[in-house]
Amino acid sequence: MDAKRVRAPSKFAWWFQRQRATAGRAAPRNMSTTRAVWLFVAALTAIRFSLLTTTDLSFDEAHYWMWSERLAPAYFSKGPGIAFAIRASTAVFGANEFGVRFFSPVLAAATSLLLFYFARRLFGATAGLWAVIALNATPIFNIGAVVMTIDALSVFFWVAAMFTFWLAVEKTPSLAWYWPFTGLLIGLGFLCKYTNAFQLISVLAVLALVPRLRREFKRPGVYLLIGMFVLCTIPPILWNAQHAWITLAHLRSRGNLDRGFGFHPAEVLSFLGQHFIVYSPLLFLALVWGVIGSWRRINQQFKILFLMWFGLPVFVFYLLLSVNKSAAPNWDALAFFGFGLVATYFWWERVQMSVLLRISASVAVVVGLIMSVVALDTDVLRVAGYQLPRSDPSDRMRGWKSATQGLEKMRNDLEAQLGEKLFLIADARDRASEISFYLRDKRVEGPGHPPAYIPESQDMVNQFSFWPRYDQFVELKPGMQRPDAEIYTEENGINLFVGRDALFIRAGEKERVPRNVEAAFQSTEPVGTIEVSRYGKVIRIWKVFLCRSYRTLPL
């Protein structure tokens, strides 16, 4: 029994022994490389901060800002992490583009530095430098370093937990606090993006597959880790239990699983193909090559096994899901930090020994940086004399503020003519969120109400379904009179919007409102069109309708 315990770790323990032996000799070089990484990350962070106010918010950012104004234990599709982060930054910098996006470059910098120190501990400072350069040359990471989404928070907690778990297994049992701290980091990541829960599978797989680590199942560390994670899951679980488990239904529909599971090979190819675009073709090719080339060493080197298992669960899950319906390329982004370090280790010594590979690596980084610049601002193509033949992806973050200003002026003019206040209904979550953010006079109808609503529906379609709505009945207090126009009532309830007029805003040029909106008002009529143009091209067009005398629809 004792002999087995001595032999089992020998397959992987050589790495730790070599690190201790070479630590002193490598210190001066590590110091200069570390300084270079800090300067590189600091320069990029300064550039990213300068870009935060150059575009309007994306509709996801605007919607997350609405969450931050209405804090809750969870939301329709995600945990509360993004809402609390935006609430913190806007409390300091205000409800503007800089305030909403403040944490994006901060988290990108922190993730880069964590990745460097982790890679340096595993493979040395030079490998860590290459890992940071490759990461920051990736278009999808650069977008997330400027635009505030759940991914910025998710990847930060993922890399942090991966690093602390390595320290836990490396230093156990002398520093046992790494175990619960890792569980906390996984849990915080889960509160930002539920995909982070896959990290538990990674942890358990590493412990189960390495003989010398199986003894951890007899120690409290791993159970403290799981316990800390479970504590973090309580808020979204309780919220979902009170809201018909809507997040589970939403996630099933996102993967098209509510319609059954089919076999669609083209969807898999689409899923994989998109990665070559958002991760840069040469960098992603190098990653795939490096991971495949390192596969045979998964049972020979502990660090390869460790990193592989921090990529496999997420990637395999979404690869299988794409057999049914193509997943978005950012859904499995967490897998590529473990895979990326494997690929870095595979390539960096080869690159140092080959001039051709050094040139290829430089070209790959330059291509990634160029793609990143274009992804962040397509105007660089126009400056270069190239006109986009199709719709500009950057237009998703343009024209919202101007369009909302036009809408607000139209609302003010109509209110002056009619002598009454109008409430706003947008045709979709995206427009309702952008309008709510960019309205100067938000004028909410009551506590928790959004500045702009979406059309009434008995279905729970998004977070708007759980906020106060214009079709909602409130308690009829003693002495209150029911509106004369109110037809459909609830016992002891009253709808305060009955008889009021609204503006309905829809994208495009359709001359009629949807049937459910038309049925809820006595009359509807178009009152104007809002167009936002850029470089002679219309990038946003809204049709605005005046809807007279609201009446509640029958159930």
Predicted regions and their residues:
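Luminal/periplasmic acceptor-recognition loop/helix of membrane-associated glycosyltransferases
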Residues: 2, 392-555
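Transmembrane-helix signature of polytopic, membrane-embedded enzymes
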Residues: 34-35, 115-137, 155-156
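Signature aromatic-anchored transmembrane alpha helix within multi-pass, membrane-resident enzymes
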Residues: 38, 349-383
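Transmembrane-helix motifs of polytopic, lipid-linked glycan transferases
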Residues: 38, 102-123, 160-164
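Short helix- or helix-capping micro-motifs
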Residues: 41, 131-139, 186, 190
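Membrane-interface transmembrane helices that cradle and orient dolichyl/undecaprenyl
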Residues: 120-126, 161-178
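Short acidic/glycine- and proline-prone juxtamembrane loop motifs at membrane-interface regions
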Residues: 140-154
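Transmembrane-lumen/periplasm boundary regions of multi-pass, lipid-linked membrane glycan transferases
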Residues: 188, 200-325
